[in-house]
């Protein structure tokens, strides 16, 4: 996984008690801008049910920030598509307690009920669906995992906190995405962590009467990384299943052109790479002690590409540099499936490697390795033939989830629908299908498999906090968002209020005390600069129950500081003023102030109690 970039829906989100270093993408960054075509609820039909296979799908919370057709939200999910949804990602504090990665994951004024609840509400229409919160990811790094796993005391802090957190928000399990444990110490500590996590989940289930939380992990596919980090015989009994990241075997970080996720080896590449494929990785995990039924094979809905050094040398094994930035993903060498189908519709040539059983496409000097319906079908046949536990996807949002490709024939999720059909007997409808939920979906386990059910009752919030209630369309702004794109709009009756439009729904919001919303600037500013002449009044506040968290109310961004140049995404302190900080997104800087007398701590990248030693230097 590489650190990704993303666009903020609300550029004034403040990282109070959240270390928000930019959106994380498993194994590849993605920032997509396009025209959106939103699909809501749909029904599924069933073909031959094959109930023994697990079909998890990773949901990325930052896909909500994309624009147009590429914007993905939980409501774009189709019932029956997956057996499990893994929410990427949960995060960890320096004291090893867990927290939300993004304020939008939790209920707040501008995001409504929050992504956690929106994802878990999918279980209302997909009654067999299970959800897990995945902790970690590539950009999370290894240091916090290593520190947390180093002692029984610190492991207990994480485990107890994680169990409470996922129960509070209605998840059915915990997924560990440590990329990657390495060395004898990490190997031993990783085993201890997983054993103690499993035991704690069993104890919690016994004391509460709830179904046990699932315990899973995303794991490496490269032989050397497997050997360096995983004591597989001692891990195997404690996992319900593992998610084998059988992709990113080749990418533009190296000049050698190869396949992102080949099923088998190819003689086109040097023999030293013969172990770098799906089959070899899955077999290796099994040979080292992981039961086949617990191995869930990874399926990418994205691809990797190169700019060929010689446009006439198109066979795998040639050389190149990263492919050009694509229209949506905006990261050299990485593309989404819905981009590849457009390339093919616009003249790219598709080739098929009969040995690796995957396609690649060439368009001029651009060479892309990707997966399509044919390679997905071949891999599903392989999973069934070899007896593995199922297949998972990274990610939901890189498939053509809304049938936006010009040659899609209206098929929603053309790649993931292959998994649903071949492993679950579920037929995903075409765009515009009947909007009723399936009465039955594929179950997640068969007799002899570890228990996979974990119906959770969301825990009532433990604390009371005073917040401004997010409301749908108000009387003074009836249908204000009808036909409008997502974004911020002025309140026609009150300069101190403004409206956030999301998916044609409106949310009333208010500026910090004394400020007014500027329709031209699109943020809150002084009354003299706002250009608004409507009488200003403050929005009422109500006391509501919420899950234990910290205040996320922020001050609006001021104008960009000319002297600061954004060289990477993230949060940065302002050396001349401890109360201020800068958020960089795609090379653009946004200025913020910490609220309520707090100061910005450069080490934690949070607003906290004033401490001059923590200010940016």
UniProtKB/Swiss-Prot annotation:
Uppermost EC category: hydrolase
Signal peptide positions on this chain: none
Stated family: Belongs to the glycosyl hydrolase 18 family. Chitinase class II subfamily.
SMART domains xref list: ChtBD2, Glyco_18
Domain of life: Eukaryota
Disulphides: 57-82, 511-524, 594-607
Keywords for this protein: Carbohydrate metabolism, Chitin degradation, Chitin-binding, Disulfide bond, Glycoprotein, Glycosidase, Hydrolase, Polysaccharide degradation, Repeat
Catalytic site positions: 179
Residues modified by glycosylation: 310
A Gene Ontology term for the protein's cellular component: extracellular region
One Pfam family of this chain: Glyco_hydro_18
EC number: 3.2.1.14
Domain Chitin-binding type-2: 478-534, 563-617
InterPro entries: Chitin-bd_dom, Chitin-bd_dom_sf, Chitinase_II/V-like_cat, Chitinase_insertion_sf, Glyco_hydro18_cat, Glyco_hydro_18_chit_AS, Glycoside_hydrolase_SF, Glycosyl_Hydrlase_18
Gene: cht-1
Residues noted as binding chitin in the record, renumbered to the chain: 109-110, 136-139, 180, 245-248, 394
Protein name stated in the entry: Probable endochitinase
GO molecular function, one term: chitinase activity
Domain GH18: 53-426
Gene Ontology biological process: ATF6-mediated unfolded protein response; chitin catabolic process; polysaccharide catabolic process; response to fungus
Provenance organism: Caenorhabditis elegans
The reaction(s) this protein catalyses: Random endo-hydrolysis of N-acetyl-beta-D-glucosaminide (1->4)-beta-linkages in chitin and chitodextrins
């Amino acid at each position: 996984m590489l650190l990704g970039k993303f666009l903020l829906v609300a550029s004034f989100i403040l990282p109070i008690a959240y270390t928000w270093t930019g959106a994380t993408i498993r194994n590849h960054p993605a920032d997509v801008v396009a025209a959106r075509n939103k699909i809501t609820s749909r029904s599924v039909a069933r073909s031959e049910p094959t109930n023994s296979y697990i079909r998890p799908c990773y949901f990325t919370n930052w896909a909500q920030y994309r624009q147009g057709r590429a914007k993905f939200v939980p409501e774009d999910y189709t019932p029956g598509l997956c057996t499990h949804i893994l929410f990427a990602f949960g995060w960890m504090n320096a004291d090893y307690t867990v927290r939300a990665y993004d304020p939008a994951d939790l209920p707040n004024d501008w995001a409504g009920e929050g992504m956690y609840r929106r994802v878990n509400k999918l279980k209302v229409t997909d009654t067999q669906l299970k959800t897990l919160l995945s902790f970690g990811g590539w950009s999370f790094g290894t240091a916090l995992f290593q520190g947390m796993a180093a002692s029984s005391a610190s492991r207990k802090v994480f485990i107890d906190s994680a169990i409470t957190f996922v129960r509070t928000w209605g998840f059915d399990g915990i997924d560990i995405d440590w990329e990657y444990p390495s060395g004898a110490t990490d190997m031993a500590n990783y085993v201890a962590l997983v054993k103690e996590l499993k035991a704690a989940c069993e104890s919690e289930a016994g004391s509460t009467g709830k179904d046990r939380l699932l315990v899973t992990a995303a794991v490496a596919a490269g032989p050397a990384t497997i050997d360096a980090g995983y004591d597989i015989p001692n891990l195997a009994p404690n996992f319900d299943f593992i998610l084998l990241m059988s992709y990113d075997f080749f990418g533009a970080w190296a000049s050698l052109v190869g396949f992102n996720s080949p099923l088998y080896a190819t003689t086109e590449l040097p023999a030293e790479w013969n172990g770098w494929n799906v089959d070899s990785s899955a077999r290796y995990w099994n040979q080292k002690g992981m039961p086949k039924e617990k191995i869930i094979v990874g399926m990418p809905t994205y691809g990797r590409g190169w700019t060929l050094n010689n446009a006439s040398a198109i066979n795998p094994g040639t050389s190149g540099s990263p492919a050009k930035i694509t229209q949506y993903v905006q990261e050299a060498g990485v593309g989404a499936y819905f981009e590849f189908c457009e390339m093919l519709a616009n003249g790219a040539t598709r080739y098929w490697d009969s040995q690796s059983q995957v396609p690649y496409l060439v368009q001029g000097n651009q060479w892309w390795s990707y997966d399509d319906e044919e390679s997905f079908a071949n891999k599903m046949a392989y999973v069934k033939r070899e007896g593995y536990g199922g297949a998972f996807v990274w990610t939901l949002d890189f498939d053509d989830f809304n049938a936006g490709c010009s040659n899609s024939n209206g098929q929603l999720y053309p790649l993931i629908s292959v998994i649903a059909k071949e492993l679950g007997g579920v037929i995903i409808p075409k765009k515009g299908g009947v909007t009723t939920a399936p009465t039955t979906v594929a179950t997640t386990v068969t007799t002899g498999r570890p228990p996979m059910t974990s119906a959770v009752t969301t825990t009532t919030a433990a604390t009371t906090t005073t917040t401004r209630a997010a409301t749908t369309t108000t009387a003074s702004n009836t249908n204000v968002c009808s036909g409008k794109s997502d974004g911020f709009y002025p309140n026609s009756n009150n300069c101190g209020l403004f409206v956030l439009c999301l998916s044609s729904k409106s949310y009333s919001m208010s500026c910090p005390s004394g400020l007014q919303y500027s329709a031209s600037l699109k943020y809150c500013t002084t009354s003299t600069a706002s250009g608004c002449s409507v009488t200003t009044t403050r929005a009422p506040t109500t006391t509501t129950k919420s899950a234990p968290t910290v205040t996320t109310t922020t001050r609006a961004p001021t104008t960009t500081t000319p002297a600061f140049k954004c060289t990477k995404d993230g949060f940065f302190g302002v050396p001349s003023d401890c109360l201020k900080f800068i958020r960089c997104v795609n090379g653009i800087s946004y200025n913020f102030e910490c609220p309520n007398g707090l100061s910005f701590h450069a080490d934690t990248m949070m607003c906290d109690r004033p401490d001059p030693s923590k200010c940016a230097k």
